């Protein structure tokens, strides 16, 4: 069992529930994370389930990280890393990339990126749209229509369609009119045909063929469809996916594999927060489950189903419970909340949510301190403005009385959060705000992360576009994307434009591209095509077992130039390479094994004066470099072969449409000679075939590149990019594989961070949402060996110093989180390792992920109800709990929305661990400055009896 964890009877029942289909109903505080972790241990150790056959899905990344932390802290088995733990979108991304179902260079865009793309076709300023809630919703309809039409075209069942509101009654009428004019039935095929042929139907349905009213709605429909198509085509042309695509493409692939033979299925599945998943996500989970499954367990809570706006339905739990095979469990003990709070939660659940009282949990928490009598209270203020000030003053009192406790002001709307945050800042009270625009969605932070993204993958189109705009090459995102697309279309990477004059010692143009350098080497130099077999993938520590090579001039093998040596090692050689037996083990039995020093010296002498080339040469070059440092330090690879070529990079430049770039796949797809046997000599011959193929394509592209780069306008933009970003990029690349030192230029960043500021923002006033970090010195001390954070800080300081961005007052939260909660700089010291291990994870971060982490020193939080879900605080103040807001005025005649508002209020209540306060004003003024009485939310009618009443939030 987990350390210090003794399960109660209900928890033990769930832990031991193996085999069959199970549904666990668990209200907050019942210890789900502990149970889910212990189930993994038991399934492996007792039931014999392989970790790789386990699938653990959560609703949020934050929940997944929490579970991973618990797993790593309590299960010592290194193989537990094979368990997939994450949300559905994260799994779908991994599935699509891992199975080559999308182009390897694809990027995932968020809603802000999508708006930027669509604004180009709408002829609107993207920043105006981003700041206009109404316009954002109108744009969302277009995005939703695009995904909806995909589902209709692919024949998805109606129950799985997630954005049905993108087609309104007028749209249906318009399509019926079109079908009437055309003389065909109005069905799914007709809808798809209209969508795919907008211009044809625009010509067909002129004003002469329909009355004026019908003509207008037809034109509006066709305009919507045209925009949706343009958005779709733009994504397709630029290898972009939105979050809808991740789900849709995964479902399509799994659904087509009806025999379950092409893609991996899982025999042991557990899914948390199932009530928050939409029907498409549930269908994907069903398709991922092996038909001969061992155990499937869903966990949910009817009281917390608050994400209907994302397609989730409360009916999900009802449908699961009604399945004949379902074994139902209840967690009936709350281990988090004291009885006086649990009484409130249970009363509300029974009376407002109509939960059977027999299913509600009992208190399992024993109080450690006597009650003071002020744990539950109603706070009244005269007006909304007074309420903001009074609540902030009350928070200050709580901070003084309970300095180690956390306090959350939970609000119903982003505007409330802004008002409260502003008042907290005015009073100098440090806090962390989780609402409205997410820190991680800000253009400034996206720019910083784009720098990390291109260091990790220089083929990242979206990251380069953000950089090109961010460092001032273009003023708009659309222009930046067009420029980067023009480069990619000509097999040019933006990094090609960043080479310094020193890099071009042969006197070539500063902007000489990778293809140009390859063609020149191919035609003028002797190329050594080489490959290594190794004990593992760690370039810093693993040993080379075999080096094979051949010399080539103008695509022809130099006679007698074949080279192959086998090398001794004391390290363990893996018996398997994925699912195949490692052939190097048997091969070594038939060859003489040379010492490390002898073998490495032989290869260096063999390659002297030649250009090295490998497939995925970054790996081979760096593992060769570190083997030389250990065993033949007199040989300096940086001095003799600093500039090497990579056929993997060539293929990615010349064949961006390919979904996989492994040698075996390339030989098949491109119809080339060779064998990929995982023996270095065979792989060298296969690589040579790829190189010859690439030369033919590259030669044809060089003239096109020269013409493009010779254009004065392109040269001007390239010069700006090189001037503003070139030195930063080159210095970062030089640091990628540095493991044993901290750059001295980080010292200045440390000193600045110790004061809670960047060097470049020392004179800038703090922004409203964040306060100075009292423990910044400790944070800096921890971060001084985190290479990724150091790189992020360097780039940030450079941008602020050059006035390219405004200071990001919340950056210190991000760097602290990366340093303390994500990256283990002891196990992964270099920038290369940290980027390889965490680039994807970093790209998914949200503000709410930081709450509850060790990196947040603030004790006061301001959050909306939706973003508070899954979090807990010692003290909770539910702000402005008045009728008309809780529930919403527009929900009162809609039973479904009214019920969801009640569940939202339950979520807000149940965030409290120790103290709970309900705040309201008693009077509001309308636009004519006339006063109106305001009444307490009706959700309090059954629980008000538990609270002290008639006290002011100021205590006066």
Question: What annotation goes with each model-predicted range?
Answer:
Residues 1-105, 868, 910:
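P-loop NTPase Walker
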Residues 23-36, 40, 326-327, 334-429, ...:
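Helicase P-loop NTPase motor core
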Residues 525-530, 535-633, 637-641, 657-674, ...:
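Conserved non-catalytic scaffold segment of RNase H-like nuclease domains
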Residues 221-224, 458-528, 536, 551-553, ...:
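Accessory C-terminal helicase-associated subdomains
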Residues 4-16, 20-28, 84, 110-114, ...:
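Conserved helicase NTPase motor core
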Residues 51-169, 318, 643:
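Conserved P-loop NTPase-based nucleic-acid remodeling module centered on helicase motor cores
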Residues 86-94, 269-273, 299, 413-415, ...:
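Conserved helicase core region in the C-terminal RecA-like lobe
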Residues 473, 478-479, 693, 854, ...:
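C-terminal accessory regions
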């Amino acid at each position: 069992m987990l350390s210090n964890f003794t399960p109660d009877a209900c928890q033990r029942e769930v832990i031991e529930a193996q085999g069959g289909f199970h549904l666990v109903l668990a209200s907050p505080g019942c210890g789900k994370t502990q149970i889910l972790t212990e189930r993994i241990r038991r399934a492996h150790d007792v039931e014999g389930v392989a970790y790789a056959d386990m699938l653990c899905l959560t609703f949020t990344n934050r929940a997944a990280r929490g579970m991973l932390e618990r797993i790593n802290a309590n299960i010592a088995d290194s193989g537990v890393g094979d368990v997939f733990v994450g949300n559905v979108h994260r799994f779908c991304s991994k599935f699509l990339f891992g199975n080559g179902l999308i182009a390897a260079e694809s990027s995932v865009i968020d809603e802000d990126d999508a708006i930027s793309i669509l604004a180009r076709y709408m002829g609107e300023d993207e920043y105006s749209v981003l700041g206009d809630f109404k316009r954002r919703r109108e744009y969302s309809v277009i995005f939703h229509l695009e995904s909806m039409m995909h589902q209709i075209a692919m024949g998805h069942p109606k129950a799985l369609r997630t954005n049905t509101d993108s087609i309104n009654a007028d749209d249906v009428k318009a399509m019926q009119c079109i079908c009437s004019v055309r003389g065909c039935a109005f069905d799914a095929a007709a809808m798809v045909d209209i969508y795919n042929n907008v211009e044809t139907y625009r010509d067909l349905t002129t004003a002469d063929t329909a009355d004026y009213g019908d003509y207008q709605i037809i034109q509006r429909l066709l305009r919507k469809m045209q925009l949706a198509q343009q958005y779709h085509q733009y994504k397709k042309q630029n290898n972009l996916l939105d979050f809808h695509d991740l789900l849709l493409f995964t479902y399509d692939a799994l659904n087509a594999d009806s025999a379950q033979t092409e893609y991996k299925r899982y025999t042991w599945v557990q899914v948390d927060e199932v009530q928050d998943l939409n029907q498409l996500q549930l269908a994907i989970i069903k398709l991922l489950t092996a038909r001969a499954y061992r155990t499937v367990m869903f966990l949910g809570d009817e009281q917390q189903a608050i994400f209907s706006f994302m397609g989730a339905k409360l009916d999900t739990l009802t449908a699961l419970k009604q399945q004949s095979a379902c074994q139902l469990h209840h967690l009936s003990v709350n281990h988090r909340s004291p009885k006086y709070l649990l009484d409130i939660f249970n009363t509300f659940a029974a009376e407002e949510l109509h939960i059977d009282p027999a299913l509600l949990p009992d208190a399992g928490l024993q109080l450690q301190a006597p009650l003071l009598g002020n744990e539950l209270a109603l706070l009244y203020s005269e007006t909304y403005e007074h309420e903001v000030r009074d609540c902030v003053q009350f928070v200050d009192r709580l901070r003084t009385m309970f300095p180690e406790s956390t306090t959350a002001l939970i609000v119903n709307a982003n505007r409330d959060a802004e008002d409260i945050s502003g008042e907290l800042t005015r009073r100098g009270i440090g806090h962390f705000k989780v609402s409205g625009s997410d820190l991680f969605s800000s253009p400034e932070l996206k720019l910083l992360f784009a720098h990390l993204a291109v260091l990790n993958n220089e083929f990242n189109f979206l990251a380069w576009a953000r950089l090109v705009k961010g460092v001032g090459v273009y003023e708009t995102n659309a222009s930046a994307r067009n420029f980067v697309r023009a480069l990619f279309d000509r097999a040019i990477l933006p990094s090609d434009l960043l080479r310094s004059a020193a890099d071009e010692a042969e006197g070539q143009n500063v902007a000489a591209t990778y293809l140009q350098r390859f063609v020149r080497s191919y035609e003028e130099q002797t190329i050594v095509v080489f490959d290594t077999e190794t004990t593992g993938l760690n370039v810093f520590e693993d040993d080379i077992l075999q080096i094979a090579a051949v010399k080539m001039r103008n695509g022809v093998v130099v006679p007698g130039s074949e080279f192959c040596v086998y090398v001794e090692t004391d390290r363990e050689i893996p018996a398997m390479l994925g699912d195949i037996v490692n052939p190097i083990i048997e091969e070594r039995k038939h060859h003489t094994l040379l010492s490390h020093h002898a073998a490495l010296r032989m290869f260096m002498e063999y390659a002297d004066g030649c250009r090295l080339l490998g497939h995925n040469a970054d790996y081979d070059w760096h593992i060769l470099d570190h083997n030389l440092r250990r065993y033949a330090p007199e040989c300096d690879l940086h001095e003799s072969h600093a500039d090497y070529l990579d056929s993997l990079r060539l293929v990615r430049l010349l064949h961006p449409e390919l979904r996989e770039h492994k040698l075996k796949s390339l030989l098949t797809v491109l119809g080339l000679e060779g064998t990929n046997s995982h023996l270095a000599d065979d792989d060298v011959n296969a690589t040579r075939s790829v190189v010859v193929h690439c030369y033919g394509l590259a030669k044809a592209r060089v003239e096109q590149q020269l013409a493009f780069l010779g254009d004065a306008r392109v040269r001007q933009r390239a010069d700006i990019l090189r001037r503003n970003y070139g030195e930063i990029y080159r210095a970062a690349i030089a640091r990628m594989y540095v493991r044993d030192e901290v750059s001295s230029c980080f010292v200045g960043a440390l000193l600045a961070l110790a004061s809670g500021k960047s060097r470049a923002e020392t004179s800038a006033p703090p922004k409203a949402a964040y306060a100075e970090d009292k423990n910044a010195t400790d944070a800096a001390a921890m971060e001084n060996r985190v290479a990724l954070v150091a790189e992020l800080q360097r780039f940030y300081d450079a941008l602020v110093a050059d006035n390219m961005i405004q200071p990001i007052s919340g950056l210190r939260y991000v760097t602290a989180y990366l340093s303390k909660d994500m990256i283990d700089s002891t196990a992964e010291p270099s920038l290369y390792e940290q980027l390889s291990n965490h680039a994807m994870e970093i790209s998914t971060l949200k503000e709410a992920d930081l709450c509850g982490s060790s990196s947040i020193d603030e004790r006061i939080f301001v959050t909306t109800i939706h973003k508070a879900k899954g979090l807990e605080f010692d003290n909770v103040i539910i702000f402005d709990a008045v009728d008309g807001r809780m529930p919403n005025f527009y929900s009162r005649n809609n039973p479904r929305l009214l019920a969801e508002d009640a569940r939202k209020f339950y979520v807000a209540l149940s965030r409290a661990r120790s103290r709970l306060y309900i705040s309201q004003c008693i009077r509001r003024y309308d636009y004519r400055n006339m006063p109106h009485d305001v009444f307490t939310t009706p959700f309090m009618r059954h629980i008000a009896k538990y609270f002290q009443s008639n006290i002011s939030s100021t205590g006066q």
